[in-house]
Amino acid sequence: MKRYILTTLFALVLFAGSAFATGHIPQNDGKSEVETYIKKVAKIKSDEIDYAYISSSMFRQMFNMLGADVQSELNDIPLQLTSIRSMRQFTATGPEGYKQLSQAMDIFLQEEESVMGMKLMALNREDGTMTAIYGDSNSTLVINDEGDELNVVFIAGLSYESFKALGESGMEIGF
């Protein structure tokens, strides 16, 4: 059963930018160009909130177009890029350079108090599913384990307190 997490306008992200419709991913030769592209095709701007969403297949396709030197740079900043769906499948088939986020998942599954420098703010277990929310004053990371599917949403520029306030105001997203 799909569960909903209260937060910002996630559903609109799926329709943000022509790249989602065309599947076109431009050639990039630098980290800043990759980040610019992601922001162009997958950003919702609401006040000061930047929300980036990239599917695992799109990220893998884009990652594979980059040179080894750029892949190495991106290895240091995976969470700045993205939100990933079906993480288990992606970590099994994804590029070596995305290992850090896989390690974050391992930490999560052991229920550590922090992931990637963000503190565990909320943990909910219900009927074999688990949702954990990590955050700090700059970002929020939501990990939703449905048992057969693991969803990860990273929201850059949205503090945990703002995330919580949006939820309390009734905005919702569905994974």
Q: Predicted segment positions?
A:
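Bacterial Sec-dependent N-terminal signal peptides
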Residues: 1-27
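Early exported N-terminus immediately downstream of N-terminal targeting peptides
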Residues: 25-102
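Short, surface-exposed beta-strand/loop "edge" segments at domain boundaries and coil↔beta transitions
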Residues: 94-103, 139-141, 150-151
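Short Gly/Thr-rich strand-loop-strand
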Residues: 102-135
